[in-house]
Amino acid sequence: MLKFALIGLGVMGKNHYRALQNVAGVQIAALCDPFCKENFAHKIYANLDEMLESENLDAAVIATPTSLHKEAALKCMQKGLNLLIEKPVCANAADAQILLEEAKRRDIKVAVGHVERFNPAIAALKKELENEEIYSVQITRNAPFPQRITDVGILADLAVHDIDLIRFLSGKEIK
């Protein structure tokens, strides 16, 4: 049984909380959010360092505001935890590079929450495009500005989905 911690209990953190409860072989061992006012069925820590010292964990989901991802991830890596980090992975490329190097150095698995790849409509489109040559891609987003992304802005928060989908559907890297 993998013991998971969930760090950040905002909109995305609550989504991960619900999802993790239904994953076989996963046990939610602890939650961490200094501003959480809600009741959960699991222990909630207000301090990440205290949680990491007190709990015997295997992995963590980081669903804090993006500006806090790097610090939380580095602390978790020091404890040897594998990570799922909500996107965008960091506020800038330099911080993401630091996390990548630390994960490699410690042999830690890190995944970024690119969930759109698993959308049934995207899976159907990927299958449809399987033997086709893609010449041009145009993506349009029609949705209101979500308040939860004010720390990094709409391009950094939502465009990462679009860029990931272009890579996924085309099977090519963007240079």
What are these regions (language model features)?
Residues V23, S54-E55, N119:
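Acidic-histidine catalytic/liganding microenvironments
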Residues P146-K175:
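Rossmann-like dinucleotide-binding domain that binds NAD(P)(H)
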Residues M1-A41:
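N-terminal Rossmann-like dinucleotide-binding module
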